[in-house]
């Protein structure tokens, strides 16, 4: 009897394709010391809304949530009386993206941390910018010098937002723009425009790949 080694060899040399873990379930907790980690004694928060951009669910008594399907992007709706902790780049830590160290082996999202903020202002002031449409690092420098720096230390806002077009078809500029806007010291949100899409995308679903990775969800809610 002759045994063929070809199938085994083909399996051995076949490339291994990494599959992004879905972010389908997780938890929201009260981060009383604001360190972004769930420490002993920090309770789960009930009644917090979480969304995948289509479905909205509410956390249970232990602060846990379960979405009905596998989600590539999950966001927590920051409620009034709380603030979101900051990500490493300074943006508010309100989203989880599958396959980017935001999920564990079981598919659970990294827990969302919300910090109590009982002295929230009665009236919200926000900085809203639109169509910065930077096309180069030089444009980013102009944006920082002429728009951001005059505001630094001189505004009374509690929230900031940039409306698209954030760049002029160059997603590589997102990190530099984030450095500029987060220097104003308020949570900063973004809304994409038609010039914020990946021009090499092969489908509509993939067209905001870079935006999602650097700036977060394109569908979300924020409460004050």
List PLM regions with ranges.
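Bacterial N-terminal signal peptides
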Residues: 7-15
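Beta-strand-rich domain onsets/edges
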Residues: 15-23
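A short, amphipathic beta-strand motif
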Residues: 24-30, 63, 112
């Amino acid at each position: 009897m002759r045994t063929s080694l070809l199938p085994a060899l083909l399996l051995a040399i076949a490339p291994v394709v990494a599959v992004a873990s879905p972010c389908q379930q997780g938890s929201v907790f009260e981060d009383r010391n604001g360190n972004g980690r769930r420490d002993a004694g920090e309770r789960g928060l009930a009644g917090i809304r979480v969304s995948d951009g289509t479905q909205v669910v509410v956390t249970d008594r232990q602060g846990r949530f379960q979405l009905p399907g596998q989600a590539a992007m999950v966001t927590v709706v920051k409620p009034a009386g709380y603030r979101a902790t900051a990500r490493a780049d300074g943006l508010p830590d309100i989203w989880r993206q599958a396959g980017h160290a935001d999920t564990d082996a079981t598919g659970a999202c990294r827990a969302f941390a919300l910090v109590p903020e009982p002295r929230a202002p009665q009236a919200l002031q926000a900085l809203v910018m639109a169509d910065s449409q930077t096309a180069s690092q030089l444009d980013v420098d102009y944006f920082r010098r002429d728009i951001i720096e005059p505001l630094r230390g001189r505004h009374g806002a509690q929230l900031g937002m940039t409306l698209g077009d954030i760049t002029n078809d160059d997603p590589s500029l997102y990190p530099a723009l984030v450095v500029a806007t987060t220097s104003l010291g308020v949570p900063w949100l973004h809304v994409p425009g038609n010039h914020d899409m990946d021009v090499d995308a092969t489908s509509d679903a993939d067209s905001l790949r870079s935006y999602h990775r650097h700036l977060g969800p394109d569908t979300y809610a924020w409460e004050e």
